[in-house]
From Swiss-Prot:
Catalyzes the prenylation of para-hydroxybenzoate (PHB) with an all-trans polyprenyl group. Mediates the second step in the final reaction sequence of ubiquinone-8 (UQ-8) biosynthesis, which is the condensation of the polyisoprenoid side chain with PHB, generating the first membrane-bound Q intermediate 3-octaprenyl-4-hydroxybenzoate. It comes from Sodalis glossinidius (strain morsitans). It is an enzyme of class 2 (transferase). GO terms for cellular component: plasma membrane. This is 4-hydroxybenzoate octaprenyltransferase. Pathway: Cofactor biosynthesis; ubiquinone biosynthesis. It is a multi-pass membrane protein. The chain crosses the membrane at residues 38-58, 99-119, 141-161, 213-233, 238-258, 268-288. It is found in: Cell inner membrane. HAMAP family: UbiA (MF_01635). Belongs to the UbiA prenyltransferase family.
Length: 290
């Protein structure tokens, strides 16, 4: 066996699943952790925590595979993506579909350990993961669908932990959508010139010269929604200090994107990992101080 060939193939699969770029998994993980702690207002059961953490990473990997499969004929025309495994030929289309099926199967097996209500909701998660990659062909709002896909773990968490879908669940879901649209618009600003050339749609194109303003308004909406959740659930001062810190990070992101320079927009996007982590720390410390 040619071990170098085997290693190259394994590395290509890892790149297809974005194992080398964990930012997407982290941006999916933080809202899931927010929900896990808020749904029961306590440290979640280890089994439930494990299922959702593993589910985040397997479903994010599945989402990356189906996204690259959907974009396989587009990515070759974009500087940032032309070296990806599918457009470069390192991975075949059949292999990608089999890998997607395997990742979804593992994710569903994890969900089967939860209650029937959560299992039913998981079908929506699969539908969103499948539909999102194709939205950029038909609408300028694919980021909105991504927000729903990235946030669907929230109602699943609430049903798994409390078997209910209270108002706080849907407020958290909305907060995640506004946050996701904001940071994915920053991400789309990196590729805006290429997207305009090849006809791919995004909120960065839709918002045009108002992109920075709308991102700021979405970030403000995120903070307001999270503030309402804190008030409704009686979270303490530490939580609001975390929100103030998140507001400071959002202001820093606005400074980064002021000239719409590609690398700076990408740095602003990456900075959202700190936002998610800070909010989680605020929730955790607030609950521990009860």
């Amino acid at each position: 066996m040619d071990h170098s060939l085997t290693q190259d193939r394994w590395q290509a699969w890892c790149r297809l699943m974005r194992i080398d770029k964990p930012i997407g998994s982290l941006l999916l993980l933080w809202p899931t952790l927010w929900a896990l702690w808020l749904a029961g207002m306590a440290i979640p059961a280890l089994g439930t925590l494990t299922v959702f953490i593993l589910g985040v990473f397997f479903m994010r990997a599945a989402g990356c595979v189906i996204n690259d499969y959907a974009d396989r004929k587009i990515d070759g025309h974009v500087k940032r993506t032309r070296a990806r495994p599918l457009p470069s030929g390192a991975i075949g289309e059949k292999e990608a579909k089999l890998l997607f099926g395997a990742l979804v199967g593992i994710s569903f097996a994890l969900v089967l350990t939860l209650n029937s209500m959560t299992i039913a909701l998981s079908t929506v998660a699969l539908a969103l993961a499948w539909v999102y990659p194709f939205m950029k062909r038909y609408t300028h709002l694919p980021q909105l669908v991504l927000g729903a896909a990235f946030g669907w773990s929230i109602p699943m968490v609430f049903t798994a932990v409390s078997e209910s879908l209270p108002l706080s669940c849907w407020l958290l879901f909305l907060a995640n959508i506004t946050w996701t649209v904001a940071y994915d618009t920053q991400y789309a600003m990196v590729d805006r010139d290429d997207d305009l050339r090849i006809g791919v749609k995004s909120t960065a194109i839709l918002f045009g010269r108002f992109d920075k303003l709308i991102i700021g308004l979405l970030q403000l909406a995120t903070l307001l929604l999270l503030g309402v959740i804190g008030w409704q659930l009686g979270l303490g001062r530490i939580y609001y200090l975390a929100l103030a810190g998140a507001a400071g990070l959002f202001l820093w992101q606005q400074k980064l994107i002021v000239d719409r320079e590609r690398e700076a927009c990408f740095r602003a996007f990456l900075n959202n990992n700190l936002v998610g982590m800070l909010i989680f720390v605020g929730i955790l410390l607030s609950l521990l101080s009860y």
